[in-house]
Amino acid sequence: MPVKRLREVVSQNHGDHLVLLKDELPCVPPALSANKRLPVGTGTSLNGTSRGSSDLTSARNCYQPLLENPMVSESDFSKDVAVQVLPLDKIEENNKQKANDIFISQYTMGQKDALRTVLKQKAQSMPVFKEVKVHLLEDAGIEKDAVTQETRISPSGIDSATTVAAATAAAIATAAPLIKVQSDLEAKVNSVTELLSKLQETDKHLQRVTEQQTSIQRKQEKLHCHDHEKQMNVFMEQHIRHLEKLQQQQIDIQTHFISAALKTSSFQPVSMPSSRAVEKYSVKPEHPNLGSCNPSLYNTFASKQAPLKEVEDTSFDKQKSPLETPAPRRFAPVPVSRDDELSKRENLLEEKENMEVSCHRGNVRLLEQILNNNDSLTRKSESSNTTSLTRSKIGWTPEKTNRFPSCEELETTKVTMQKSDDVLHDLGQKEKETNSMVQPKESLSMLKLPDLPQNSVKLQTTNTTRSVLKDAEKILRGVQNNKKVLEENLEAIIRAKDGAAMYSLINALSTNREMSEKIRIRKTVDEWIKTISAEIQDELSRTDYEQKRFDQKNQRTKKGQNMTKDIRTNTQDKTVNKSVIPRKHSQKQIEEHFRNLPMRGMPASSLQKERKEGLLKATTVIQDEDYMLQVYGKPVYQGHRSTLKKGPYLRFNSPSPKSRPQRPKVIERVKGTKVKSIRTQTDFYATKPKKMDSKMKHSVPVLPHGDQQYLFSPSREMPTFSGTLEGHLIPMAILLGQTQSNSDTMPPAGVIVSKPHPVTVTTSIPPSSRKVETGVKKPNIAIVEMKSEKKDPPQLTVQVLPSVDIDSISNSSADVLSPLSSPKEASLPPVQTWIKTPEIMKVDEEEVKFPGTNFDEIIDVIQEEEKCDEIPDSEPILEFNRSVKADSTKYNGPPFPPVASTFQPTADILDKVIERKETLENSLIQWVEQEIMSRIISGLFPVQQQIAPSISVSVSETSEPLTSDIVEGTSSGALQLFVDAGVPVNSNVIKHFVNEALAETIAVMLGDREAKKQGPVATGVSGDASTNETYLPARVCTPLPTPQPTPPCSPSSPAKECVLVKTPDSSPCDSDHDMAFPVKEICAEKGDDMPAIMLVNTPTVTPTTTPPPAAAVFTPTLSDISIDKLKVSSPELPKPWGDGDLPLEEENPNSPQEELHPRAIVMSVAKDEEPESMDFPAQPPPPEPVPFMPFPAGTKAPSPSQMPGSDSSTLESTLSVTVTETETLDKPISEGEILFSCGQKLAPKILEDIGLYLTNLNDSLSSTLHDAVEMEDDPPSEGQVIRMSHKKFHADAILSFAKQNQESAVSQQAVYHSEDLENSVGELSEGQRPQLTAAAENILMGHSLYMQPPVTNTQSLDQQCDPKPLSRQFDTVSGSIYEDSCASHGPMSLGELELEPNSKLVLPTTLLTAQENDVNLPVAAEDFSQYQLKQNQDVKQVEHKPSQSYLRVRNKSDIAPSQQQVSPGDMDRTQIELNPYLTCVFSGGKAVPLSASQMPPAKMSVMLPSVNLEDCSQSLSLSTMQEDMESSGADTF
């Protein structure tokens, strides 16, 4: 513990009472006044009573010697007091002020919380003003009367005065009783208030009486306490007197033995009376203090605290002046023979040492002293006693004589010892009774007793023989052991009481004062800790500085030339540092004074020696750092360094061990204003250091060039600057310099940073820097990326080459290390010391300073490197630019640790660089793969238009679940760009698709198509499961490209012909057979396909399975609807067959359908936001299309039929989360359908007004179509819904009427037009379908769904075809909701935007059925069909070529008879026009085309291939599917 701290612990009142003490105790030398306990806190009485026996004995023992030199001791004591007291007073005052600055409310915690809550409520909520109207009975009556009279008067219009008077009289008459009542109430209230006032008065009186009683009781208690205290004081005085008598007796006995022993030597006691007088004097002054002692716990605690501090202070003071006694004497000096005197002196010296030791022990822990003052006093006394006894025993043997004391004397000693023990025991018992106030006094008095017998024994032993001494030793040991036991017991009791009292006091303070006291204590403790730590550091730093000064002075003499050079550099550095780096003035000045002077005078060789020595000494390192900071200023990048940890250069360049110590130091430096803008440092250096560089160049030649060759050579002058060059090199300031002047500025920065060094760097760099370049390049490259990005981009350009230099530098730095050992390298040491000293220096604290100081040197070296690096800039410029800072750091790094260490960081950096390169390469590879895949697909499928829509489909499939917006962007022509150009609408989707699906896609496109075609049913089932998961997006992408050729075929006239041709009737039959056999599987496929078609347009892949899946998608409803559609869609299947190769055609019809679906996806995107829950089921369906993509290969013919059927089914599947097999789909679909059907009732109405409800209903549908719609028109979708509603609003009236009144007629007309519409589907869908979809679907949803669903149910139930329409009705119901939402979302805009590339394809296939149903029902069949024709034509025009695969879906009511009655040709042509209910359902179906946007309103003129086959097959498949799905259809329905 520093002495200063302990001195400051002295009580505040020392100075005040110093004079008083001198007056009161004229005989006591002032030095003892420190031992005098002064009042603490209240100051009501002196606490001297609490001081220990050591204080009394010290008064006795020091009495004579102090009297000899009273003036000296007095003056010394006064000085000590001045030193001790003033700082304490100042500190306490400051503490008080600080404590006062903090105002702490005296609330309980609960109250505080309540207040906080109230304040928060007030602050958060504006005051709510409540107007409370008091309704008095009188006023109320008057008001009522007045109102009634006014009402009467106003109608009558009588204004005459008589009427007014009558009214007033009536009012008075009516109010009179009320007034009376009020007066009565007032009288009663007054009486009550009087009673209350009386009660309050009585209460106050009672309170006063109680207060008086309590005050009297308290006074009595206080008096009793005072009496008790007085009694205790008297008792204590008596005991003390008794103890004094015992002490006198013991002293007499001792003197008797001594005199008997000394008789032979003719020495006689001379000073006994004086010693007794001293004892009396020293002991008695305590008595008045005892009487006056205040029993309050606080005073006792303070008294305990103060004496300890004072004792310690006196011991330190005594150490200072030999005249003052080191510790209070415990025994009066007795004349003894020379031997005895020597032994006494030895004992006194030992006691002094013991006291000093104890004082030091006490100083070790300030907090412990404060908390355990009494304990520390007793411990000191015990330790001193025990040590004195042991030492005295050692001293006895040489002093032993042949004299034997008489037995009586031994007995008397035993008796006295027993008495003293008994007295101590009695005191212990009585102390238990006494208050805590008396305890310290007794303990102190008890401490006195053990001391006397010890001394007496010592005196006795001197004259006794060995045998007598042995016996005496035994007796004394027993007595001492007893004493120790008693004292320990007493101390334990005292500690327990004192601790309890102290803790209670602390708790009381903490509880009563709450945080204020705690905060104050914390502040004081923190201040003590800070001051103590600062003092310790100051002392250490002083010694280190002194040693450094001495070493530097010795080195100064060695080289005068270097001194002059160093002085020049130092002066310049000082100017730079002052401008650049502000510091604490006191520390900065001192450090500069210590560092700059020696540094200037230090020769290079001496500096190296100092560095070696300084590395061992943290203080030297600190000086070097400070000096470096002063000379070089903080590195521009020091802020980054701080983040990097200690030195950025160290951090980048080499092993963490060395760089780590520096980094924290750098951080410390960084905390200050050390780091300044690069401009200031570089500019400042650029202005001045250039001149310095010229000087430096001159000085550098003086230094050996071997050192200069290394990059460190520029730092030669840096070593000359000061031993801190080690620190400079360690900080790796050069790296910072490079980073600061990253490029063109690098040479000036070097000049600036290491003012002398820049010249050396320039001169010596060419060889060394080149070498360094070769070695350092690697680390720089890795490092470059680390820092270059953080720092100036211009630096990046300059330092691109430096990275190469850094590699060479790392090698050269290793070389530099060897020259460093030579004195020549003294100039180089800034760099060399980087390597050597940095290891030690980094660990040292000086590194904090070094980074700043080395910054300049390092910058110089870096500049050299940069210059050299500039030559090899041609190498990795990009990396070097990034690593400009890194280069500088790496350069420093290699020297600081060995080159190998630098390579390690470079390896990490290189790893990062390699990772970045790999990421870029991977991205490039992926892009190239995408390009190649796009080209391969385009080559395989020559129709690029088809590729684009297929790509869009794949994108929509993958992106719809992810983001429908991407689908929108890609759904139009952008998809092909997306794949071909490698510009991803959704790069993640493309990458995922390409990476995961390349092999699968190629296999599927080339080989799997046919295989899948062969086994469509099985694949359909598997596809359902797999696609339900996330499998679809990956595969769908590849299948999508395969169907691409079909969309172009569909847009092409042959595609339309194919739709009409319906050549693949057999394939629909196959599909029908499949339906009959794998109704569930196909339905599952189709359920999957439909959502897939919605999202991905994958249903094209599963054309064969589609007809059954359409029926089975939603086992009940899909089976019916899908079968109906399949009947009609069977003609559509021939379209893909006719369009091109059956496998490709299947996929192609799928792809056109998929394209339509992606548009639907885009459409649905806008709705996805609203119906997320619905969309999620839809998203699972998109995976489903993946298997369907393979399936279409197997089921080529059915795919077209599937597409229309799949539209409703997909809508249904989207409605229901269940994308699994048909059975599982049935339940969820039924639930979803029921919900949607209910919602659909509301949806059309809401959509008509808002268009929001359909969006919610479309949640399930949103999977594909919904996402696509939302993609295209998220914001406009609502507006478009409104537009659609407006356009469709007219159609709604028509649709509603048509549905309700002309379902069959409309369906037939729609069918008739659908044939024509195939060509004009796009036109009507774009121009008019949105109207029909928005308004017509709304009406259809509301009216037809509920008006006609029973009809469709009956039809579907009655006929095998109809049951599927039922399922499909449900499907369409869900789909219709979806379509309505899609239309509402702005099928116009979506149709306009997406129908051109993709949505048209989707609309004709999947949505045509629902769209035609909706259109046919709401609009006059001809008009609506015309609209559809126009829409279809538009769709075809807008690269909706897949329109060929449009399914003409009639209302189910119409479809059932029409399908049964209509010839295959009619079936092909007949649009599947559902009943108004089915139209509602297909309004959901429209959702898909609506996603295409315009197609839903237009009838989907979907030519189902081979309607007859489907009619037959569907009848079978319907029967089977109805069996499977009809029940579920009925349930769901």
Swiss-Prot record:
Q: In which tissues is it expressed?
A: Ubiquitously expressed. Expressed in photoreceptor cells (at protein level).
Record's InterPro entries? TALPID3
Can you list the disulfide-bonded cysteine pairs? none
Q: Which GO terms describe its cellular component?
A: centriole; centrosome; ciliary basal body; cytoplasm; photoreceptor inner segment
Phosphothreonine is found on: 1042, 1046, 1063
Comp. bias (Polar residues): 42-57, 560-575
Region listing for Disordered, in residue ranges: 32-57, 309-339, 377-400, 546-575, 1129-1156
Query: Which keywords has UniProt assigned to this entry?
Result: Cell projection, Ciliopathy, Cilium biogenesis/degradation, Coiled coil, Cytoplasm, Cytoskeleton, Disease variant, Joubert syndrome, Phosphoprotein
List compositional bias (Basic and acidic residues) regions by residue number: 309-321
Q: How does it assemble?
A: Interacts with CCP110, CEP290, CEP97, KIF24.
Disease linked to the protein: Joubert syndrome 23: A mild form of Joubert syndrome, a disorder presenting with cerebellar ataxia, oculomotor apraxia, hypotonia, neonatal breathing abnormalities and psychomotor delay. Neuroradiologically, it is characterized by cerebellar vermian hypoplasia/aplasia, thickened and reoriented superior cerebellar peduncles, and an abnormally large interpeduncular fossa, giving the appearance of a molar tooth on transaxial slices (molar tooth sign). Additional variable features include retinal dystrophy, renal disease, liver fibrosis, and polydactyly. Short-rib thoracic dysplasia 14 with polydactyly: A form of short-rib thoracic dysplasia, a group of autosomal recessive ciliopathies that are characterized by a constricted thoracic cage, short ribs, shortened tubular bones, and a 'trident' appearance of the acetabular roof. Polydactyly is variably present. Non-skeletal involvement can include cleft lip/palate as well as anomalies of major organs such as the brain, eye, heart, kidneys, liver, pancreas, intestines, and genitalia.
Q: What does this protein do?
A: Required for ciliogenesis and sonic hedgehog/SHH signaling. Required for the centrosomal recruitment of RAB8A and for the targeting of centriole satellite proteins to centrosomes such as of PCM1. May play a role in early ciliogenesis in the disappearance of centriolar satellites that preceeds ciliary vesicle formation. Involved in regulation of cell intracellular organization. Involved in regulation of cell polarity. Required for asymmetrical localization of CEP120 to daughter centrioles.
Q: Would you tell me the protein name for this molecule?
A: Protein TALPID3
Q: What is the organism field in this record?
A: Homo sapiens
| Organism phylogeny | Eukaryota, Metazoa, Chordata, Craniata, Vertebrata
